[in-house]
Amino acid sequence: MKSAARLLLALAVSLPAAALAQTPTEPVTMHATGHFDVKISPQTPDNPQAKASGLARLSLDKQFHGDLDATSQGEMLAAGDGSTSGAYVALETVSGKLHGRSGSFALVHRALMVAGTPREWTVVVVPGSGTGELAGLDGAMTITIVDGRHDYDFSYTLPAH
């Protein structure tokens, strides 16, 4: 018992006072904007269940410009009539720099369109997916498409340095 007490005392004395008094810092809220180029390629289903499902499987390849200088690759599943109504879900991994901070993170998409009008469209950071200087990243991205140009508006938080 005395050995354990001595060990605890030695540890307490050796820890810097600042480490003992640290309080968690609040995340910094940021806002990033820009546009991206995207290549969407149909993938051929390789099993009977995928063919029978009627779902379209597509690969995504993106180049982000602006506050997010990055590339991404991902996979999308889509259903619907292909022109005015449908839905898609997707996952993509983004690698590059966000406001100068390097790393990678994953995004998850969910969208519904009815008669040519988006009903829901969410794109959020997958919790725990941030790496490098983007570890702890959390946020949501809004995408608008006008005349074929994809613009993004990314509201996010990162732990303070």
Regions found by a protein language model. Give the residues of each.
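Targeting-peptide/extracellular-domain and disordered-appendage signature
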Residues: 3-5, 11, 15-161
